[in-house]
Amino acid sequence: MKFGLTAVLLVTSAGAFAQFGPPPGGPPRPAKATAPEDLTGYWVALVTEDWRWRMVTPAKGDYDGVPLNPAGRKLADTWDPAKDEAAGNQCKAYGAAAITRVPGRFHITWQDDNTLKLETDAGTQTRLFHFGGKFPESGDAGWQGYSVASWDHQAGGGFGPPGPGGSLKVVTTHIKPGYLRKNGVPYSANAVVTEYFDAIKEPDGEQYLVVKTLVDDPQYLAGQFITSTHFKKEPDGAKWRPTPCAAR
């Protein structure tokens, strides 16, 4: 019996070694090589919800659907686009907490093996997603903040390896204060933005990108602000039209 148990353990160990490979010791594989899905290319926003807040500038005081606390509502009620324009703050609604809701296009490429770059034609913004990056200790990193990325792989069954597919998870901090909506609905420098990017390929070959965004801001929000935004992949950049930020 002892011999039989030993043999079973040896076979099991050998199988596990073959399945998972040798113990880790070398450098980690770059993020580009371990990507569970291809997010690169041109993507156009599909405005299928929240039309009145995304396609036109809402009226002052229209912050339905955003869990503002009293401080957030008070600040939103003071919105003055002319003051933003005079101060050079036309990009307040194009920051990391809101840019996915701005109608337009994304262009996603790899800047290097561990940095994914997302550009927008609306507002001409650039975001960098750093795999294995560390958040700075202080200071703001501009409208797009500092983003740390990771692959959120699907779990495998039992003791198996991760299953196929997965999401890109991005956590952004150190953001310059801005607007969740163009009519002055605020978020502060303390906001934390967590995003999940998922690519979907339909049987007919059409490809879509779904971005789930969660904004936490203890200064102006009484709860988490959650949105889900959809994009469709385009064959090339023929319709790419960079435009400047607009305050209204």
PLM regions and their residue ranges:
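Cleavable N-terminal signal peptides
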Residues: L5-T6, A16
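PEST-like low-complexity, intrinsically disordered acidic/proline/serine-rich tracts
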Residues: F17-R248
